Structure formats: structure tokens, C-alpha cells
């Protein structure tokens, strides 16, 4: 009895115990409390049950909805100023960042951020960032790239909301180019293969069949293609510069969190965009002021698109923090499909057969691009075993 028993010995002892007299049973039971039975060492502990993260699901939901709302009200604001030929696209883009900056200022004044309420969580504190002048200078490249990517995106979607979404889905192509040429970080061979299919998908979406001759010709909005590629390029620079920024000693602590970093980037983006707006569209500013006072579509479109842009980007950042970059990248690709279908319904403009096929190819391989390296790694590890 002084030697601890294993599981088999324990079962045998219990069966013998049942056949003993009551007095001996009491003695044996007391002894078993003094010398408890040991569980076999090779029995694994039960795995904890996976918990359903309702807040994460809500963040994803509002991220998608916020992006769709942004696209809808961005289109409304651009139509109110005359569309892509109205001469006020840069003004709309800049004032959207102005709305973002005002909202960021309100968050700092109130010292809390209500975005977590969308995930049924308590609001988090958002104190002013304790950045130095040197930190602001270091953040300027990120702010510039963010401003350029946003403005180019507005020009792209203002030219063609549907084809613009397809072009923006090809962002990994420009990202691979930028990271290879400027940062010495080329993609893997598997990713390079995916890039060819992404380009092919966008190219096929640009084709239109002549009903008389049956010959395919390239037909697309050049403005949407050019500004979409510019936007993708600056988005790639922004991502790489942001990574460089965050490894600077002590900067993350002085920023005070991801929310502060994003807010500061939007404020810098607005301040950088403002002189560009004045230099390029100053002649049309009197016209814009009249429209802003009298046109409700412009008023609502500007405010809602600016707020939606801020909120959905912040939600995207929060999902990356909770899930990791790969999962968020796949979700971002799926979001393209959601927004593409949504904008087709809102604008009443149907996708052509070529656009449907091309978009499906491009988006599918963008999703594969996001996970291909991890899939290859798992396959190699399996073969080694």
C-alpha cells in the first residue's frame, strides 16, 4: 500500500476491496487518501474546447460593411461634384481625410476609443501619443504613402467603381515589385507563379467581345487602371515603411498603441494632401463651396465616406492584431468579392462575363497568394517526416 499504484493496479485493488469486510474497507480507503493513485504519464491531457470569438466575428462583419458603405458614399460624393470630369476629386479625397482627422482629434480629447463597442467590448483608453518631433519626422513617409494611396484609390473608384475594385484586387503584384526592387525582399517562387494568374485575371477582365466580329479587344477605363496601379504601389510602400517604423526603439511605446498610430497617420495624410489639393484644384474651390452648402448628397457623402474609411481601416487593423497577417489578408481578399457584388447592385451596372471570370481568377489567386508559403511549408514538413 505504500507504493503508488498505476491505473491497472488501481482497478484490481478496487475489485478486491468490494469483497473485503467493512472494517478492512475503511482501513484501505483511509490509506488510499494518504497515497493517491497516479495517472499514467503517457495519457495526454484533454485539449481545451475552442471558444467562439464573437467580438472577432463582429469586427469582420463591420469591416466588410464599413468598406461597402465607404464605396457607396464615396461614389455619392464624387457624383455630387461632377464625377471624374468634375475637377474636384482631389478635394473630395482630401476632405475625407479631414473628417478622419477631426474624428481622431475627438478621440484624443475624450481619451477613449469606442470602436471596441462594435465587438461588444468595453471602450479602450486613447491618450495623446507621447511622440517627439523626431518621431513625427520618421512617421512622415508612412503618412505620405497613406495619403497618396487613398487619393489614388478615390480617383480609381471615381472613374469606374467596378473595374476599379478588380484593379485594386491586384495589389500583391505591385507589392511584390516594390518589395523586390526597393527593399530587397523578393517573393517566393510559389508566390511568383500566383502573380502571373493575378495579372491574367485583371487582363481578362479588361477584355470586351465585339458582338459583330466576335473578336476580343481591350476595353477598360484607363483612368481607373492607372490610378488603381498607383494606389496599389503606394499601399505597398506604406506597408513596408510602416514595418520599418515600428522596429525603431521605443517608438511603439511613445505612440501608445495601434489606434494612436493609425490616427496620427491619418492626420499627417490630411496635412500632406491639403497643399496638393490647393495646388491642383484651387480654381474649382468656389464651385465646391457652393455645392457643399446646397447639395445634401455631397454633405452626407463626404461625412459618411470619411467616417466609414476611418472605421473600417481601424477594424481591419484590429482583425490583424487578433488573427495574424495571413488570415486578415485572406479576409481582405474575400472582402473584394463582397464589395464587388455590393457595388454592382448599388450602381446598377452589371459585370460583363469577362469581368466576372477575370475577377474570379484574380481574386482566387490573390487568396492563394496569401497562404501559399504556409501550404508549401506544411507539405515539405510532411514529406520530411
Spans of features found by a protein language model:
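Polytopic endomembrane small-metabolite transporters, centered on the Drug/Metabolite Transporter
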Residues: 5-10, 15-385
Amino acid at each position: 500500500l505504500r507504493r503508488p499504484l498505476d491505473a491497472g493496479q488501481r482497478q484490481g485493488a478496487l475489485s478486491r476491496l468490494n469483497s473485503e469486510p467493512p472494517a478492512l474497507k475503511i482501513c484501505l480507503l483511509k490509506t488510499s487518501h494518504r497515497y493517491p493513485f497516479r495517472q499514467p504519464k503517457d495519457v495526454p491531457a484533454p485539449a481545451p474546447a475552442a471558444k467562439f470569438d464573437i467580438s472577432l466575428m463582429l469586427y469582420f462583419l463591420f469591416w466588410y460593411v464599413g468598406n461597402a458603405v465607404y464605396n457607396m458614399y464615396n461614389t455619392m460624393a464624387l457624383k455630387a461634384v461632377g464625377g471624374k470630369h468634375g475637377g474636384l476629386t482631389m478635394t473630395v479625397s482630401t476632405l475625407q481625410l479631414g473628417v478622419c482627422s477631426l474624428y481622431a482629434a475627438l478621440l484624443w480629447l475624450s481619451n477613449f476609443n469606442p470602436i471596441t463597442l462594435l465587438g461588444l467590448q468595453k471602450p479602450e483608453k486613447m491618450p495623446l501619443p507621447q511622440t517627439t518631433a523626431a518621431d513625427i519626422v520618421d512617421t512622415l513617409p508612412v503618412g505620405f504613402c497613406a495619403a497618396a494611396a487613398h487619393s489614388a484609390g478615390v480617383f480609381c473608384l471615381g472613374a469606374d467603381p467596378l473595374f476599379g475594385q478588380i484593379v485594386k484586387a491586384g495589389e500583391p503584384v505591385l507589392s511584390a515589385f516594390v518589395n523586390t526592387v526597393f527593399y530587397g525582399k523578393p517573393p517566393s517562387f510559389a508566390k511568383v507563379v500566383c502573380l502571373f494568374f493575378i495579372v491574367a485575371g485583371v487582363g481578362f477582365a479588361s477584355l470586351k467581345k465585339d458582338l459583330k466580329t466576335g473578336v476580343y479587344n481591350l476595353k477598360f477605363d484607363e483612368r481607373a487602371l492607372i490610378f488603381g496601379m498607383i494606389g496599389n504601389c503606394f499601399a505597398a510602400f506604406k506597408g513596408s515603411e510602416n514595418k520599418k517604423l515600428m522596429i525603431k526603439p521605443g517608438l511603439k511605446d511613445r505612440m501608445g498603441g495601434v489606434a494612436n498610430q493609425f490616427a496620427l497617420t491619418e492626420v499627417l495624410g490630411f496635412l500632406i494632401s491639403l497643399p496638393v489639393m490647393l495646388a491642383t484644384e484651387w480654381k474649382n474651390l468656389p464651385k465646391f463651396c457652393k455645392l457643399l452648402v446646397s447639395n445634401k448628397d455631397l454633405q452626407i457623402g463626404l461625412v459618411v465616406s470619411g467616417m466609414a474609411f476611418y472605421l473600417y481601416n481601424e477594424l481591419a487593423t484590429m482583425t490583424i492584431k487578433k488573427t495574424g497577417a495571413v488570415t486578415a489578408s485572406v479576409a481582405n481578399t474575400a472582402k473584394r468579392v463582397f464589395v464587388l457584388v455590393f457595388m454592382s447592385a448599388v450602381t446598377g451596372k452589371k459585370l460583363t462575363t469577362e469581368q466576372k471570370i477575370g475577377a474570379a481568377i484574380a481574386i482566387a489567386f490573390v487568396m492563394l497568394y496569401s497562404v501559399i508559403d504556409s501550404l508549401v511549408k506544411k507539405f515539405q514538413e510532411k514529406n520530411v517526416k
